[in-house]
Design a protein with these regions (language model features):
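Structured, active/binding-site neighborhoods that engage oxygen-rich ligands
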Residues: 1-252
Length: 252
């Protein structure tokens, strides 16, 4: 449902088909999750080192999953450094930070660390933190109204436009500032987890990343139906499924 031009802008599409497969969003989300699990209680330097290691290791193992050009270069550097990106890659992979955090301060701090290893532009960090904040609020019982208010107040995102207002002129963009507010809006308008995914895709943008951001918040708010979990798991490699199961066991 994602093309360079003329993206699909409706909600009535098959959620899965025989060609469905995971993308870079899945790979990097699992890499971040493993890094954070492996470094619980350690200092920032250790966490960042683990993030770089896991992201490079998994990224190199799954090379053709839709990474950005600059990120591909970073994956293969011997001494990688952040490259001042404000792309939406920082927000698509951040969910583990919100899931592990014991309070909002920790959620924001972990989100910042996960972004900074590549996306150290202020907008790249903000996108990751806004996503983590919305997810943390969702999983700790906040209402949609409270989530909207917090995100608008703390991050300055304009969440006033509806999806119907966003959709006509929206297109494939990869910046945090043009992806994260739209993804959060899709969650705010959703009726359940599946509807959240469909709404995000229907905007017609960077579909997998929109759905990754919207879906992470929706999972925390609604939970995920078991049939959808099963459909996703069977499309993972044994290695990635093992990482997912380990994450679910240790984060529970």
């Amino acid at each position: 449902y994602e093309f360079d031009f003329n993206n699909y802008k409706a909600k009535d599409f098959p959620l899965f088909c025989r060609h469905s497969e995971f993308t870079d969003d899945t790979v990097m989300t699992l890499a971040v999750a493993k890094a954070l699990l492996d470094t619980c209680g350690q200092d920032d330097a250790a966490i960042k080192a683990a993030l770089v290691h896991q992201m490079q290791q998994l990224g190199r193992a799954y090379p053709d999953k839709g990474y950005g050009t600059r990120f591909i270069g970073w994956l293969h550097e011997d001494d990688p450094h952040p490259y001042n990106s404000y792309g939406n890659g920082s927000a698509m992979r951040v969910s583990a930070a919100a899931e592990l955090a014991e309070d909002m301060e920790q959620a924001l701090h972990l989100a910042k660390l996960t972004a900074e290893v590549t996306h150290n532009h202020p907008e790249g960090i903000k996108g990751a933190q806004a996503t983590a904040a919305a997810m943390f609020l969702a999983r700790t019982g906040s209402s949609k109204a409270d989530i909207r208010t917090y995100v608008e107040r703390e991050f300055g995102y304009d969440l006033s436009r509806s999806c119907d207002e966003i959709r006509p002129d929206y297109h494939h963009v990869e910046s945090c500032q043009e992806t994260v507010p739209q993804a959060i809006t899709a969650f705010l308008e959703s009726a359940d987890f599946e509807d959240a995914l469909r709404t995000a895709v229907s905007l017609g943008g960077d579909s997998d990343t929109l759905a990754a951001i919207t879906g992470s918040i929706a999972e925390a708010f609604y939970g995920v139906p078991e049939n959808l979990k099963a459909e996703c798991r069977r499309r993972l490699t044994p290695e990635l499924e093992a990482l997912l199961l380990a994450w679910e066991a240790r984060a529970a």
